[in-house]
């Protein structure tokens, strides 16, 4: 499943599989400019930190076309900077969004004073590189994560950190796929439904079912019972931002799952690329938490389920403290506490690999 993010150079169009209507409908959403891309990000046509980063990289290319339309003018650089900042602010929690925009911006600045067409050509190559890198990174995460999984393990996951949330293969689901690819047998998955947007029930179950990996959907509030009954051996989740100390922001409800895992002696792992680790954020206290529209909670489809006038908390993410995390699975291996040190070593190793 690696065709859910596509870019047509000929049509200058970013094509996204619309995740809002999965699993019952498979249809594409077309982004022709920055406004379309921001809409896709904010309404969760595309979601998941790595996938957001890849989308943002292509969105920068659309921004360049837009800044020069109908023809390059004296102010195109200023206009492009404005469009890039709008794109970077589309969703506040997922650090890969700004990471991708800043990577594209740094390529631009390294070119001196390029003309617009030269910049666009270079950016398209860079966006495609980011796209392909993420696929390779996720497979590396899967290989490292597979070492944590034994035959007959039942793995609980929360939200969707699979192929749909990345360029392909997945982070948390990459660990599952990596274990299966490594020959582990009897692997099963419990996908928490993940209210209110139901990424687990709709997307994780969709992916794994397509792959033939046994998956069972569970109500979010059944986690404790399932663990208490010995039905869960590992928990593996993704992340939208990881602080320098190892605190991890992920879909709302993840913190509760981590607490339950600790109570029942079940290892709780986070799987994410190094690009999701924000070393400029000291701890989870500094991670901004997005609030989403109340209608996601007050309505099921078109039907209202809460009384008019009753307020709603609809935080999209929570932060799991580092002390609840047994390991962070990255492309550089499984990081262990203390995370400040192991994160620093992982980045140093990655820098060495690139040099």
Swiss-Prot record:
Active site feature: 240
Signal sequence interval, chain numbering: none
Enzyme class: isomerase
GO terms assigned for molecular function: S-methyl-5-thioribose-1-phosphate isomerase activity
Domain of life: Bacteria
Site label Transition state stabilizer, positions: 159
InterPro entries listed in its UniProt record: IF-2B-related, IF-M1Pi, IF_2B-like_C, Initiation_fac_2B_a/b/d, M1Pi_N, NagB/RpiA_transferase-like
Gene3D superfamilies, sorted: translation initiation factor eif-2b, domain 1, Translation initiation factor eif-2b, domain 2
Pathway terms, separated by semicolons: Amino-acid biosynthesis; L-methionine biosynthesis via salvage pathway; L-methionine from S-methyl-5-thio-alpha-D-ribose 1-phosphate: step 1/6
Catalyzed reactions: 5-(methylsulfanyl)-alpha-D-ribose 1-phosphate = 5-(methylsulfanyl)-D-ribulose 1-phosphate
Residues holding substrate: 47-49, 91, 199, 250-251
GO BP annotation list: L-methionine salvage from methylthioadenosine
Keywords: Amino-acid biosynthesis, Isomerase, Methionine biosynthesis
Pfam families for the chain: IF-2B (PF01008)
Keyword Phosphoprotein: no
Keyword Isomerase applies: yes
Record-listed E.C. numbers: 5.3.1.23
Coiled-coil intervals: none
The family this protein is said to belong to: Belongs to the eIF-2B alpha/beta/delta subunits family. MtnA subfamily.
PANTHER family xrefs: METHYLTHIORIBOSE-1-PHOSPHATE ISOMERASE (PTHR43475:SF1)
Stated role: Catalyzes the interconversion of methylthioribose-1-phosphate (MTR-1-P) into methylthioribulose-1-phosphate (MTRu-1-P).
NCBIfam families: eIF-2B_rel, PRK05720.1, salvage_mtnA
HAMAP family associated with the record: Salvage_MtnA (MF_01678)
Protein name, as recorded: Methylthioribose-1-phosphate isomerase
Native source organism of the sequence: Oleidesulfovibrio alaskensis (strain ATCC BAA-1058 / DSM 17464 / G20) (Desulfovibrio alaskensis)
């Amino acid at each position: 499943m690696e065709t859910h993010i596509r870019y047509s150079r000929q049509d200058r169009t970013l094509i996204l599989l619309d995740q809002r209507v999965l699993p019952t409908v498979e249809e594409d959403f077309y982004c022709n400019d920055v406004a379309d891309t921001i809409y896709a990000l904010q309404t969760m046509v595309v979601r998941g930190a790595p996938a957001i980063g890849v989308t943002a990289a292509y969105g920068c290319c659309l921004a360049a076309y837009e800044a020069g339309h109908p023809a390059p003018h004296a102010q195109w650089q200023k206009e492009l900077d404005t469009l890039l900042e709008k794109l970077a602010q589309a969703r506040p929690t997922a650090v890969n969004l700004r990471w991708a925009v800043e990577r594209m911006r740094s390529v631009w600045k390294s070119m001196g004073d390029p003309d617009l067409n030269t910049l666009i050509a270079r950016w398209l190559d860079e966006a495609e590189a980011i796209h392909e890198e993420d696929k390779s990174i996720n497979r590396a995460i899967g290989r490292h994560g597979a070492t944590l999984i034994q035959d007959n393990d039942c793995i609980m996951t929360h939200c969707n950190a699979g192929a749909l949330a990345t360029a392909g293969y997945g982070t948390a689901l990459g660990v599952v796929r990596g274990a299966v690819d490594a020959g582990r047998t009897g692997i099963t998955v419990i996908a928490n439904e993940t209210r209110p947007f139901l990424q687990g029930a709709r997307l994780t179950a969709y992916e794994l079912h397509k792959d033939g990996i046994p998956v069972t959907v569970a109500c979010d509030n059944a986690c404790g019972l399932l663990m208490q009954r010995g039905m869960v051996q590992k928990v593996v989740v993704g992340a939208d931002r990881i602080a320098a100390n190892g605190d991890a922001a992920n879909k709302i409800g993840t913190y509760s799952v981590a607490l339950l895992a600790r109570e029942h002696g079940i290892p709780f792992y986070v799987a994410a690329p190094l690009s999701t680790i924000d070393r400029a954020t000291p701890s989870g206290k500094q991670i901004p938490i997005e609030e989403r529209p109340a209608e996601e909670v007050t309505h099921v489809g078109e039907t209202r389920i809460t009384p008019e006038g009753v307020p709603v908390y609809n935080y999209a993410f929570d932060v799991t403290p580092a002390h609840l995390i047994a390991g962070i699975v990255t492309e550089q291996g499984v990081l262990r506490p203390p995370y400040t040190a192991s994160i620093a070593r992982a980045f140093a190793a990655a820098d060495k690999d690139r040099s």
